[in-house]
Amino acid sequence: MKMRYLAVLLLSAVLLVGCGNNTTTKSGNTEVDTTTETKQKESLADMMETKEYSCTVDDSFMYYVMYVTNNSDKVVSIDLNVTALDSSGSMVGSSSDGTKAVAPGQTAGIWTTFDEWDKIDSFDYALSVSEEKEYSPVYSDLSVDYNTTGSGIVASVTNNGTSAADYVWMDVVYLKDGKMVNFSELSFMDDNQELQPGTTLSQEGTCYSDSGFDDAVIAINGRK
């Protein structure tokens, strides 16, 4: 399964406090094809506002996307583990990935696909959050502009900083009547996976959905 960087009624949230690197974890369960939003709490993990999206594409696979907004005053590293469940609660798939150097106020994206689209009824997730020690954020250095079109989105990102930004991505969730119908991930990098200082790069994404879309929500990832 490929994982990059929401689905819905939050049934439970369990907080586990890690040791050593001050990692905190929260977990939850969400149903398919809906959207959910958590509220801020007191720990580092629970100061992350999460939105989950999921949809089936062409009776072929299912997207699962989580947007995480950092409502803390720390730069954080985020790791996500997702388990897909069938209607009886049995596990049918799992995937893990994360994102680095998420600045205060930044919304970052993590996503995956599941081949077991016809078996999935809900998702369990565990979100681990720790203060970033290895990378620096680039969020405040980036200017983002985008327009939706009849078929998708056209976007540009400018690096206003003085050093190169690494692995700059925009995740795009396309919505119709509030439900996810498709997804794009756009990269803003040269051959060295960098967005150089003073450089603007543009990309286009297409929403492949017979129903079309009436809204698009984005998340930005990057580090240095």
Regions found by a protein language model. Give the residues of each.
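N-terminal, intrinsically disordered, polar/charged segments of Gram-positive cell-envelope systems
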Residues: 21-63
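Short, solvent-exposed loop/turn segments enriched in Ser/Thr/Gly
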Residues: 58-65, 147-154, 201
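Terminal connector regions
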Residues: 112-152, 206-224
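C-terminal motif of bacterial Sec signal peptides marking the signal peptidase cleavage site
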Residues: 15-18
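Asparagine-centered strand-capping/turn motif at beta-strand->loop junctions
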Residues: 68-72, 156-161
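Short beta-strand and strand-turn-strand segments in soluble, beta-rich domains
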Residues: 48, 77, 87-96, 135-138, ...
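Intrinsically disordered, low-complexity Pro/Gly/Ser/Thr-rich segments with frequent PxxP/GP/PP motifs
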Residues: 90-118, 183-210
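Short acidic/proline- and small/hydrophobic-mixed sequence motifs that coincide with surface turns
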Residues: 71-78, 91-92, 120, 163-167, ...
